[in-house]
Amino acid sequence: MTEPIRVLVVDDQELFRAGVEVIVEAQEGMSVAGTAGDGMNAVRLVDEVNPDVVLMDLRMPEMDGVEATRQIFLPQRVARRVKPVRVLVLTTFNLDDKAATAIRYGASGFLLKDVTPLMLCDAIRSVHTGNAVLAPTDLSALLDAQFRAPTPVPDSYLSLTQKERAVFAAVARGLSNTEIAAEIFASESTVKTHVGAILRKLALRDRVQIVVFAYEHGLAP
């Protein structure tokens, strides 16, 4: 039997936390691992209960969601985990600078707080499998503003094969594995293998980090 996706709900509004908790618990294959009302307690609970997905509000007292995300993905914390944790940030603004910063720190995407319960649960499942949750156009607009002066391309990128670079560019454009497979005339399993190699060589966590890497180093289309 497949283990349920364990979700940590982080928001300073108790009513919102309670509502999300009800939605998650009602879904087959999901459970609530805990709740927190600020970033400091969120970081502590991630270490204690090791959730699969964190729903992270951006604007909270004590410690906001951006700083909490940064601390969650500190190398020393990541090294202690037996499985990866994904962070999905929640915001009331479509193009939010704080969301872009959280994505740079390791978040897998962002959702507006007025999404439907179905969209929320689909997003949880998606980030749990390592996908990004946001439209490529939204991500492009966010990252364009963040990386106006790209940094030099690191040696790790130069280690990618020609085919891996083609897949890298396609992921940076927001294409799915199915779309990439059609573009490079390969099977989806081959594309998955290439994506895995890219993540390993560049020391990245997931596809959204490939997009961030592309913008950070001036490799975005």
What would you call each of these model-derived segments?
Residues G29-G37, L45, L204:
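Short hydrophobic/Thr-rich beta-strand motif most characteristic of the beta2 strand and flanking loop
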Residues A99-R104, S108-G109, K113-Q162, A166, ...:
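Short, flexible helix-to-coil linker/hinge segments that flank and couple to helix-turn-helix
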